[in-house]
Amino acid sequence: MNITDIREQFPILHQQVNGHDLVYLDSAATSQKPRAVIETLDKYYNQYNSNVHRGVHTLGTRATDGYEGAREKVRKFINAKSMAEIIFTKGTTTSLNMVALSYARANLKPGDEVVITYMEHHANIIPWQQAVKATGATLKYIPLQEDGTISLEDVRETVTSNTKIVAVSHVSNVLGTVNPIKEMAKIAHDNGAVIVVDGAQSTPHMKIDVQDLDCDFFALSSHKMCGPTGVGVLYGKKALLENMEPAEFGGEMIDFVGLYESTWKELPWKFEAGTPIIAGAIGLGAAIDFLEEIGLDEISRHEHKLAAYALERFRQLDGVTVYGPEERAGLVTFNLDDVHPHDVATVLDAEGIAVRAGHHCAQPLMKWLDVTATARASFYLYNTEEEIDKLVEALQKTKEYFTNVF
C-alpha cells in the first residue's frame, strides 16, 4: 500500500490552508474523494444523465445500468445474498429511520424492549426513542465498561425474552470501540430479537460480511467511504424486508395505482420512492471499485498502525485526556486540560490541521464521559504518521499558548 500514490489520487489534499499544507484528520465526519469518483460523477452528468428504470432510450438505459450495477457492487462489497436486500437511501440516518418506521412500529407493543448502548450516534438513538413512544415499548441501554467497550456478559444481562430489537454501532464514532457484532447477533437471536447495525464508521475501514455477522439490518453511508454525499444503503434480510411496509410512497415504488388502493413493486424498489439518488449511487459504485483495488485488509492494517502511533505520541503530551480503549479503530478523541475543544480545533485550523470538535452527535456518551465536548482526530487511508506528528506538535503549541496567555 503506497500512501504517496494514494494521496496523489485525492486532489483536495494538495492545497494549503492558512499558509500550511492541509492535514485532513476529519474522515469520521466525511472522507475526501478520489479522482476516480469525481470523474465518474462528471462522466454521468456529461454523458448519460437520465432518469432510471422506465425509459427505453439510450441515456435512460445507460443510467439504469449504472444505477443497478452500483447496487450489485454494494451487494458484493458487504456479501449480501441478493440485490433485493440492498436499498439505496439518503444515508445511514435515513436507513436507521426506515427500520424504526417500517419494522419497529409494526412489530413493537407494550412490554417489548429495544436495547441500544450509551455510545450510539444520535441517528441510532432518536428513531428508537420515537418508536417506543409510539408503541408503548421500553428503551434499555447496555452499560459500558470503564474503557468504553461492551461486555458480552452485560449484553446477556440486558437482552431478555422481551427484547425485540438490539440496535448498535459497529464502530463508535467517538471512542473508536469496535463492537462484537457477531456475538451480539447470536445473543439477540437466541432471545428472539433482531439486530440493527449502524455501520457508518466500519464499512469504510474494514471488510464487512453481513452473512458472517448474521445481522438483520445494516446501515452505511457513501460519503464516509470516498463516495458522494447524499446516498447510503440499508441492507436487510430478505424475509424481513418482504414483510415490511414502505415508509415513503410515490413514484417508482408502485406496481399499480387505483383510485383507492395501490400495490408496491417487489424488493428492493418498493422502498425507493421517487427519483432515486442516481449519480450518488453510481459514484458509490466507483468508490467501492477504488477501495477494493487497494484492499480493505490493507486499509484496516494501515489505520490500525496510525491509531497505535497516535496513542503513543499522545502519551508524550502532558495534560491530555484520551478517551476509549487501547484497541480501537482509526480515531483518537481527546481533550486538553483547561482548553475548550472548539478552541483546540480553531488553533489547529490555523496550522492547517482539520479536526472535529463538539459532542459528535453523541450527547449521551458525552454525559457518560462527564464532558460536554471533545476534540477528535480521525484517520483514513490517505493519512500518514508525519501528519500525526504535525498534530502532536500543534497540540503542544496550543497547550503552551493557553498556559502562557491565560
From Swiss-Prot:
Biological-process GO terms, alphabetical: cysteine metabolic process
Keyword Ion transport carried by entry: no
Superkingdom: Bacteria
Keywords of the record: Pyridoxal phosphate, Transferase
EC assignment: 2.8.1.7
Cofactor annotation: pyridoxal 5'-phosphate
A Pfam family: Aminotran_5
Active site: C361
Activity control mechanisms: A Cys to Ala mutation in SufU (Cys-41-Ala) has been described to be a competivie inhibitor of SufS activity and a non-competitive inhibitor.
Signal peptide: none
Function in brief: Type II cysteine desulfurase that acts as the initial step in the SUF-like Fe-S cluster assembly pathway. Catalyzes the removal of elemental sulfur atoms from L-cysteine by using the cofactor pyridoxal 5'-phosphate (PLP), resulting in the production of L-alanine and persulfide. Activity is stimulated by SufU, which acts as a sulfurtransferase that receives sulfur from SufS via a zinc-ligand swapping mechanism and transfers it to SufB.
Family membership: Belongs to the class-V pyridoxal-phosphate-dependent aminotransferase family. Csd subfamily.
Subunit and interaction comment: Homodimer. Interacts with SufU; this interaction induces an opening of the active site pocket of SufS. Interacts with frataxin/Fra.
Matching PANTHER family: CYSTEINE DESULFURASE, CYSTEINE DESULFURASE 1, CHLOROPLASTIC
Name listed for the protein in its UniProt record: Cysteine desulfurase SufS
Name of encoding gene: sufS
